[in-house]
Amino acid sequence: MAVEKTVPGGVRTVLVTGGAGYIGSHAVLQLLLAGFRAVVVDNLNNSSELAVRRVAALAGDHSRNLAFHKVDLRDKGALEKVFASTRFDAVVHFAGLKAVGESVQKPLLYYDNNVNGTVNLLEVMSAHGCKKLVFSSSAAVYGSPKNSPCTEEFPLTPNNPYGKTKLVVEDICRDIYRTDPEWKIILLRYFNPVGAHPSGYLGEDPCGIPNNLMPYVQQVAVGRRPALTILGNDYATRDGTGVRDYIHVVDLADGHIAALQKLFESSSIGCEAYNLGTGKGTSVLEIVKAFEKASGKKIPLIIGPRRPGDAEILFSLPAKAEKELNWKAKFGIDEMCRDQWNWASKNPYGYGSLDSTKQNGHHSYGSIGSPKQNGHCTNGFSESTRHNGHNGYGLVDSAKHNGNGHFH
């Protein structure tokens, strides 16, 4: 976990797009604990405002450095207002749609949201002189490589619209750096984020049917689904199931701290890509067994056919990030499953349903230490918050801005 410290050069203000999402919310918490000020923008399309409230509660006194605006990046006018109110030192860009299957069915939606939204963001950043960016890319840009470990030099051949949108944005970033060397950009290619904050109060809350393995496993464990369907058990792997590189979401969040520090400390970073993974492959069955051990629950299995296009084995070589960002994943599969189960057992139906009820003796939110559980604001948040897309909330009284948009 990130230690509390101030980044070189003093406290800096960072815009976090998609900061209410799974990875984004964990990154916002780590940013606050590392001494940054974080302003979250999110359209809440596939995320929950309750995640931001829980970040505030977990951040304690650091929550005074947190603000939220409900903004869709495709609404350039709303984004302009956010930049007009605050001077940002850098942007961490998570916002985007991320379901591979949905991207195949609705490619235009993905290009509009992921690409057009990013173009708006980059244009507004440039207009306001903010030219430091950490972009949430994906290992999906590699497609289905035949060999592993996967390095940053592997061919970029995404095989679905989601991965293609990530590559398009990467290409845009490389193009704008070539035309304007003042830009400093880091592209972080994640492998498979799993786990949850060790407190059990932040985690993945997928809307609808989960798109990834771990949330599906957790839903079976808490009784929301009868069984887990494994897509293929005839791969040339140690147990016949696909092998992937799973990374704890807190390790991933800390990778963003390391990337930001690199942007601030380096005079000539340019536009660089880094893999964020553990460098170790874990099979589907190994994940299931580790989760059963962590939860004490038996996961019923159904063996289904392979999914077209899935690689047998895909894991990272994170040596470049270890060397240049001074970052290395700390958590193993057992810790990932432990924290995932801690989250799932406290929040079996995600954020919404348990913020107003008690289950198994636990208050999913109130036990952190403060807030009301009736849908009103919580620790660090103003009772009279306006949700009009223009006001940070909880910070209007405790972190007013001066005329230049800085926090006091």
UniProtKB/Swiss-Prot annotation:
SUPFAM superfamilies: NAD(P)-binding Rossmann-fold domains. Substrate binds at residue 138. Residues 369-408 are annotated as: Disordered. Belongs to the NAD(P)-dependent epimerase/dehydratase family. This is UDP-glucose 4-epimerase 2. The active site is at 162 (proton acceptor). The gene is UGE-2. The keyword Protein biosynthesis does not apply. Residues 370-383 have a biased composition (Polar residues). It comes from Oryza sativa subsp. japonica. Gene3D superfamilies: NAD(P)-binding Rossmann-like Domain (3.40.50.720), UDP-galactose 4-epimerase, domain 1 (3.90.25.10). It is an enzyme of class 5 (isomerase).
